[in-house]
Amino acid sequence: MLKWALIFFVISLIAGVFGFTGISAAAAGVARILFFIAVVIFLVFLVLALMAGSAIV
């Protein structure tokens, strides 16, 4: 799953570069959506890791 989070992050960075430099306004919208998806995935994995760490100890 970490692989997919990194893929979303890279795609959002590329779309952001294209969108925010004026190449395509639609890419900026895609970059925002993918960025927030990547942040949500990161937060979910962070919470799961913290819960799993406390369950092991």
Swiss-Prot record:
**Source organism superkingdom:** Bacteria
| Subcellular location as annotated | Cell membrane
Q: Which InterPro entries match?
A: DUF1328
Q: Name one GO cellular component term.
A: plasma membrane
The record gives the membrane topology as:
Multi-pass membrane protein
Chief location: membrane
User: Which UniProt keywords are present, listed alphabetically?
Assistant: Cell membrane, Membrane, Transmembrane, Transmembrane helix
User: So where does this one cross the membrane?
Assistant: 4-24, 33-53
> What family does the entry list?
Belongs to the UPF0391 family.
Which HAMAP family would you find in this protein's record? Answer: UPF0391
Protein name (record): UPF0391 membrane protein Atu4467
